[in-house]
Amino acid sequence: MTDPAHLAANRANWDERADLHFADETGFYRIAELLAGANLLLPIERAELGDLGGLSVAHLQCHIGTDTLSLFRQGAAEVAGLDFSARAIAHARRLAGTTGLPARFVQGVVYDAPSLLGEARFDRVFTSWGTLVWMDDLPRWTRAVSALLKPGGRFHYVDCHPTAWMLAPDDHGNLALRYDYETPPESPIPVEVTANYNLSTRILENRQTFEWSHSLAAIVNALLAAGLVIEHLGEHEALQWAIGPRMTQDTDHLWRLPPDHVHVPLTLTIRARKPG
């Protein structure tokens, strides 16, 4: 059972971040491009998802909906987004109205997604970028994912690699081990958010969050225990945001380490299928 205090702190943080990200003063969220008709899904996501022509997609932890709406531009016929932040969902609905893209946005926690998103089941379930650190119960998470899928449907996971979650810059700006590979549900990592990954210098008022690290084995085994079949695992030396000062952003909007830095996986991708 999620500690209500942890959930409340995380929600307050993300409500505040949602307002900041929707304002998009730094351009990190590329809202102007979205409104101009762009597909904001990054190359890693596009390659993993493939053509979504005619398919229904549930996007979990959708935040302000920029990627959710981009799923239509990847070919999806029906899209539903879910996030626990009321402010994020309000902004997502506003973007849907402005773009004219008919996404359905629902507020709630991922564990309750099968009931919150209604009786219909989906061809695809998608989650990406900074999602799993907010989950304290992997089996409950994967059961929700499985319940959302139609028989034969697929789950697409794109997020920071478990190894990368362990890293932080040293005094020379190189990434070094700092955090545990895995944290128990009852002992999250308390994190005071003092820097915004969207490159804003604005100081948040609700800085305290609680996060969980999950090993690769724990993630994979939870998916298997939920009855899903792993079809593909991928590791990538690029990430949606910078986790160290020596990382630079390329024209594809992904951040990478310099050639002289030790090579480490930064993004993990998983494709899993529900039998049937």
Please name every model-derived segment:
Residues 1-31:
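N-terminal, positively charged/glycine-rich alpha-helical extensions of SAM-dependent methyltransferases
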Residues 26-55:
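Conserved alpha-helix/loop element of class I SAM-dependent methyltransferases that forms part
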Residues 56-113:
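Class I SAM-dependent methyltransferase SAM/SAH-binding core
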Residues 114-125:
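A short acidic, Gly/Pro-enriched loop at the edge of an enzyme's catalytic core
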Residues 123-139:
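A short SAM/SAH-binding and catalytic strip from SAM-dependent methyltransferases
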Residues 139-154:
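A short glycine-rich, Lys/Arg-flanked "PGG" loop and its adjoining helix->strand segment in the class I
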Residues 154-197:
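Conserved class I S-adenosyl-L-methionine
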Residues 209-233:
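Short alpha-helix
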